[in-house]
Amino acid sequence: GETRVVILPDEEYRISCTVSFGATVMDTQYLSLPVTRESFAAELAGARTFCPYEQIEELMVAGLVRGGSLDNAVVIKDGAIIAKDGLRFPDEFVRHKVLDIVGDLSLVGRRLRGQIIAIKPGHPSNVALAQRIREVMGYDDE
């Protein structure tokens, strides 16, 4: 399925995200929460990045996993989770995707209000949304 990331008007900054990887250990997950300092610290900051074992070499060659270890990442191999002390949250995968959205949208450079609805998001779609918000709001003219 395709990636979709949109922003709708809202009084608060909220992210609603669905991920689905088609693998049993990484089944469909959904999370919706207001993004505040408190929710960031309690619900998102501890969510680690993740990848299938088969992609590790490719990521290393591309220089994308510098400093990566089982202390700060989750690896999926043959339907099993490989991570120090297991998952931190039952839905750690979607939490990490929401964490990515927060980080990528910080490129807007302003405090956001609005509901982000994300389906299978990734860095390219998140950054494209950040750029579009800057364009529409006139922040690129400053």
Regions found by a protein language model. Name each.
Residues 1-142:
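Short acidic-hydrophobic catalytic motif
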